[in-house]
Amino acid sequence: MNSLLVYQALEEAAKKWPQSPAVYDEYGVMTFEELFKETEDLKHTLLNLGVTKGMGVGVMACNSRNFISGIFSVIGCGATVMPISHQLKKAEVDDILREANLHAIMDDKHGVCPIDKECKHIPMNVEAFRFAFTSISKDEQFASHVTNPAFIRFTSGTTGKSKGVIVSHQSAIERIESANKVLQLGVGDTVVWVLPMAYHFIVSILLYIKYGAAIAITKDFLPKNIQKDEFGNYFL
């Protein structure tokens, strides 16, 4: 799986900075080593369920450590992942599934149930995912016209009908390398995250992971809920 450059970004971060904080959230601090281990465990669960290279899988969740693990675990299987906001209405989710021809969808139960099928319950260290395959044949390859696809995201649709954009592993890494030449983020930096991860994963969350910056995930946007101790650690 040497071609899975996006997954390697997390794996390499765990090797370089195993005890450095990757995520601050309402459950405490999660190190890069812990984030990678939980992602690996979820990846193997998905592989055992039948997720594999050539598939498209949606991950619908709120801003959370599990959303990050979910995105990377799908990519680690060799599949293409679509980050989906948990705030979408059922009709909007139905449109996405129909337009994107995803093979499966996994969600954290914080939004509508995305698919009317029997789902597999996948426990995480905190909370859980539910997973189900769609009616798309597993033999139908997803984004066959793109070399080494990693992400699919839909445009906002403000200038017309939403369109799916495929981003390859190579393109995703090139984007964040270019962005960080300006941002200069690295180990010891912490980004307080308030925007929807589903719409900003590639050039934000992936960038922070690759360069060792911690992500402080807020439950809401109120400054009073973001506190920092004398050591610079965030507690929400």
Task: Set out the residue ranges of the language-model regions.
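Solvent-exposed alpha-helix faces
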Residues: E40-H44, G160, E177-N180
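A short helix-loop-beta submotif of the ANL/AMP-binding
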Residues: M55-G56, C62-M82, H86-K90, E99-H103, ...
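Conserved AMP-binding/adenylation subdomain of ANL enzymes
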Residues: I173-T190, M197-L236
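Conserved helix-loop-beta element of the AMP-binding
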Residues: N101-H103, K117-F129, A172, T190-V192, ...
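ANL superfamily adenylate-forming
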Residues: D107-T147, K161
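Conserved pre-ATP/AMP-binding loop-to-beta segment of ANL
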Residues: S3, Q19, I136-F154, K161, ...
